[in-house]
Amino acid sequence: NRPFYFQELAVDTKDPNRLYNIYQPLSVSYDGGKSFDPVPMIPADETKGIHADFHAFWVNPADPQHFIIGGDGGIGITQDHGKSWYFPETIPVAQFYHISVDNDRPYNVYGGMQDNGNWSGPAYTWKRGGIRTLYWQYLVGGDGFYIAPDLDNSRYGYGTSQNGSLYRYDKLTGYYVSIKPPQPDLNTRLRFNWNAAFAKDPHDESSLYYGSQFVHVTHDKGATWEVISPDLTTNNPAHQKPDYGGLTLDVSGAEMYNSILAIAPSPINENVIWAGTDDGQVQLTRDGGKTWKNLTKQVKGLPNESWVAQIKASPYTAGAAWMVVNNYRKGDYSPYLFKTENFGKSWTRMADDTKVKGYALSVVQDPVEPNLVF
């Protein structure tokens, strides 16, 4: 169960003793929560299956036999209190984390989806009828996050999933193999975020960066790795305990903390690499990882121990970067978007509550017009 992430209780409007416990399975209580029984559901890999994990629930106030549940794969509808289900497949509710493209013609779009793996599909097609579902290919399993083609040969590429899992895949055979960085020594336990930082080197197609509490680099497409940074997080032991106030442990890696969320190598200068963490640290190297500077105190208005969700190194100036931070996990839904033009010596907040409503997750600077930012 994941009370820190998702779990809801719903009450039947006709019967206050009937409660629904909404998390991975769905269970119901008929005695005000003293006991719960599972609601039968067909697994998602079978015809008309209902996809966990469940995040939303609605009971028809006029008919308690009719309810709708929402999860990582869409919605499920029942008219007979869960005895049978309808799973509508025409609602576009896929949740993408990261997107990339290759250089094929037509070029392909790649994306990692919440609890639905990593996929690729054509951006357009030469055939009549448009882009069909069957044109999309499943590449790497698990919770899909980063996925990026190998531009030397788009048959191959890289995909990430939960717990820091990193794979190199083969589109033709469907096979993929783990290339996750190993522990640097027997006494060092790596801390990978649920959505661990990944970046390709814009100067070398064989080089990749991956983040635990360290920045890891490979120069041979994942065959070997080396650590090029110290621990860039606060490394607070109190945030790394297996027990958090008595809450039921998820035991899936989603509770990992003090980890790197963002890595951004500069497309202008190969020695410049930015990194951001889930505990509010902003770090920079200007010598390819030999030395790192903590820039956190230079970012005025940065909430303490917030999530540095994304850093984008500018394609126009080596010292410029954009940074997205969010703090909604602490009830702060303000958008935090910062920009530096001097290697992090000073930062300007580019978006606030007067310009953008809701917290921010990502930023993109236009590749042609530097003043156009999304």
What are these regions (language model features)?
Residues N1-F374:
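Beta-propeller blade termini and top-face loops
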